[in-house]
Regions:
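Glycine-rich phosphate-binding loop used to anchor ATP phosphates in small-molecule kinases
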Residues: 55-98
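Conserved substrate/cofactor phosphate-moiety recognition/catalytic segment
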Residues: 18-63
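ATP-binding Walker
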Residues: 11
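Small-molecule kinase domains that catalyze NTP-dependent phosphoryl transfer to phosphate-bearing small molecules
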Residues: 119-159, 166-168
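Hydrophobic anchor at the beta1->P-loop junction of P-loop NTPases
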Residues: 5
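Conserved phosphate-donor/acceptor-positioning beta-strand/loop module used by diverse small-molecule
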Residues: 82, 97-117, 146
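Walker A/P-loop
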Residues: 14
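P-loop (Walker A) phosphate-binding loop of NTP-binding proteins
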Residues: 8
């Protein structure tokens, strides 16, 4: 099983992904799409930096999928953390077509997302966060959607456990 968690900045993808992997799975790998893309050092482009950024993001998706395939072949469940936009869901679906896979959009309100962003170390501007939020709001290619504005990390992790292990 491969679960791709997408959502805006500060939606809780990392926290939820790690909680789910630790609490709900016997063997699980967490692949952070940001960490994969940061392997590209010169030049490194953020998603809002134009056409080159989409090329780099597609390359990051392909490498995240290579890692996912390797972990699945060793018997691990996989959680991929990424911001899926443009045609990236199609790239994930094509690259992982032979596996059971779900794209789950975690979508808090803009206000909750911004509040969470301001209560953690600085990473991106409010304008950049808004760009990411709007791309996630417009995203149509996902399998499941959850509004975690008022849900705890444990609640969302339990929900993921139910859809992946109890009602696959």
């Amino acid at each position: 099983m491969i679960t791709i968690l997408t959502g805006p900045a500060a939606a809780g993808k990392n926290t939820i992904g790690h909680e789910y992997a630790t609490r709900c799975c016997s063997q699980c790998s967490v692949i952070d799409g940001d960490a994969v893309r940061w392997m590209l050092r010169q030049p490194h482009r953020a998603p809002w930096d134009g056409e080159e950024s989409l090329f780099q993001h597609r390359l990051g998706v392909k490498h995240a999928c290579l890692l996912a395939k390797s972990f699945v072949s060793e018997g691990y469940e996989v959680v991929i953390l990424d911001v899926v936009w443009a045609d990236l869901a199609q790239v994930y679906r094509r690259e992982l077509a032979e596996f059971s896979m779900k794209i789950v959009r975690i979508m808090p309100s803009w206000e909750a997302s911004l509040d969470r962003l301001h209560n953690r170390p600085y990473t991106i501007t409010d304008a950049q966060a808004r760009w990411v939020y709007d791309t996630q709001k417009e995203l149509k290619d996902f399998d499941l959607d959850i509004d975690n504005t008022a849900r705890s990390v444990a609640e969302v992790s339990t929900w993921l456990d139910t859809i992946n292990h109890k009602n696959p």
